């Protein structure tokens, strides 16, 4: 690892620890030439995922785009930034474990709906309204009615109720 101060390539590791939920390793290093201490991060390099949009166009999977959509849906719901990050981590991890590098945008949308419903019913409705392209009040009412009926049937077990809604 090259020293940022003197560009010497030999350094020793002083300390290593896992960070970002185990997705990277943080290393504290010391240059053997000038003694400068610096921090490096090691991350697994993921194979790129190609998202196939509704219109057939392809684009690279963009973690920040997914997070923006989730943040928008979770606005003022009490869902923490950490919970949203973990949700994106889980979805990205699931996509990376697939044998296929191509994924339909609709698959990602369904994954988000299943997970976001566990965090907030309001966030679920907001995300569903954009993802499923609600055209009017009737679409909202139908989804809310199913959500309410299933919530009563499950005696308040919203995650199960919301999960079963994703197949509707």
Curated annotation (Swiss-Prot):
Binds 1 zinc ion. One of its GO terms (biological process) is negative regulation of DNA-templated transcription. Keywords: ATP-binding, DNA-binding, Metal-binding, Nucleotide-binding, Repressor, Transcription, Transcription regulation, Zinc, Zinc-finger. Residues 1-21 are annotated as: Disordered. Residues 7-20 have a biased composition (Basic and acidic residues). InterPro entries: ATP-cone_dom, NrdR-like_N, RNR_NrdR-like. A zinc finger (unnamed) spans 3-34. One of its GO terms (molecular function) is zinc ion binding. Its cofactor is Zn(2+). Residues 49-139 form the ATP-cone domain. It holds the Pfam family ATP-cone. PANTHER family: TRANSCRIPTIONAL REPRESSOR NRDR. Negatively regulates transcription of bacterial ribonucleotide reductase nrd genes and operons by binding to NrdR-boxes. Belongs to the NrdR family. HAMAP family: NrdR. This is Transcriptional repressor NrdR. It comes from Synechococcus elongatus (strain ATCC 33912 / PCC 7942 / FACHB-805).
């Amino acid at each position: 690892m090259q020293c940022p101060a003197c560009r010497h390539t030999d350094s020793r590791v002083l300390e290593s620890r896992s960070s970002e939920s185990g997705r990277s390793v943080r290393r504290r290093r010391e240059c053997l030439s000038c003694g400068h201490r610096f921090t490096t991060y090691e991350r697994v390099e993921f194979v790129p995922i190609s998202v196939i949009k509704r219109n057939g166009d392809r684009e690279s999977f963009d973690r920040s785009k997914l997070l923006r959509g989730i943040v928008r849906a979770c606005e003022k719901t009490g869902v923490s930034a950490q919970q949203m990050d973990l949700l994106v981590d889980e979805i990205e991890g699931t996509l990376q474990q697939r044998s296929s590098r191509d994924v339909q945008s609709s698959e990602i949308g369904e994954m988000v709906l299943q997970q976001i419903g566990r965090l907030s019913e309001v966030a679920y409705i907001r995300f569903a309204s954009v993802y499923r392209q609600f055209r009017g009040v009737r679409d909202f009412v139908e989804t809310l009615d199913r959500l309410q009926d299933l919530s009563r049937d499950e005696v308040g077990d919203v995650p199960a109720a919301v999960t079963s809604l994703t197949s509707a």
